[in-house]
Amino acid sequence: MDEDSEVTQPQDQSCWATLPDVCLRRVFWWLGDRDRSRAALVCRKWNQIMYSADLWRYRTITFSGRPSRVHASEFESALWYVKKFGRYLEHLEIKFLNPYNAVLTKKFQVTMRGLLSCLGKSNNRLRSLSIQHLELDRLVWRNSIRGSLIKSLSFFLKKMGKHLDHLSLKGARLTVEQGCHILNSLSYMRNENVASELNIEDFFSHHLAVYGSSQFNKAMATFHNLTFLTLNYNCISDELLETLSENNAGTLRTMNIKCHVHDPHGQVVWGMSWAKLARQASNLKVNFFFERVMKYERLARILLQEIPVRSISLRSCYFSDPDWSMRPTLTDLLPTFRNTLQKLTFEFNNNHESLDEQLHLLILACRKLFYFKIWAFLDVKFVERILKSQEEGQCSLRTLKVRIYTNRYETNEEDRTLREIYRKYRKLIDSELNYFVIAYPMM
């Protein structure tokens, strides 16, 4: 239909024209913006359906960080959408993908200023906001552009903070002062905020010892309803744990903590601080994600026995260190959490030492373990040993994912053995496991 045609009500209506509203809304739900606009021209009833609130509650707005004719209208389209349907928004996700230069970051900043201003005036129901991976410490963000964007975001959060239940600013990469300014904006209308989910992983730039900042601890003290908290280990301190114990003991359920090799992580955190938090927040489970922090001495300072650890991920990518050994971590440290560990993820280069036996014993020791994923140098028979233990009821895995590194280009022999193992345990695998095993040349 020509977009210039008037909205008409045909005399001879088809069954489509008499569809119940609930069915029409379902049809519109699956249409893209362009098709929705065209469908709204069919008749008056369809035009009214176009403005149904439930069609516009969830929105992901993606901006390309590369100059392109194809993506030229993204910024204008985003503003048009917010002006037209922003009042219905409840969940908003904004993505700005790898900005190429300062021209595009400036365009994004100006668009965000208009978008957030319009949303702040028309919307009173926004519950979830996610703006991830801005990486504001990159050179493409000039100081003036970065400052203007932070100012717009802070002003918006001051106005909308009383409604927001979920906020994710993962990967913003701010200074401590900038980050705390944004966090304080959430509690501007009152001295506390109602957010239950907060994701500030990589919120601060690398190399910052946030744990020593009184500004950060004061900002976190305004949160009184946290259920899920995601952050970096360079934010963890006795003072933060004390604050969480006092203000969020009745609500806090999950903490996700990332520890990167480039983030300061040598601070002393007392086990008694973790013990108090675990005692008062009795349903708390903590998930750790380590990136290239692999040495036993460092891990032992962080993974204290008082922490109710649910999940541990240890990734070193492809880095190899012949002076490093994973064995003490597997035999002495991780079994400490045998009564709480449910998920284990490993990715490391252990070409210099065999760990099959230690890994197998760790799986058997952790009776609540249901998820096990590993990329490492292993014997193919390691998989068969795990499946045999599963068959005998010695472990209760529901997910088993293994990438077996080899030092050969050809993996024909390993592939043949893995096929034989699968045939032998096919009934067990099909009935109990999310199973993925592969041999992978590591050259």
From Swiss-Prot:
It comes from the Eukaryota. InterPro entries: F-box-like_dom_sf, F-box_dom, FBXO31/39, LRR_dom_sf. PROSITE patterns: FBOX. GO terms for cellular component: SCF ubiquitin ligase complex. GO terms for biological process: SCF-dependent proteasomal ubiquitin-dependent protein catabolic process. Residues 13-59 form the F-box domain. Keywords: Ubl conjugation pathway. Directly interacts with SKP1 and CUL1. Substrate-recognition component of the SCF (SKP1-CUL1-F-box protein)-type E3 ubiquitin ligase complex. This is F-box only protein 39. It comes from Rattus norvegicus (Rat).
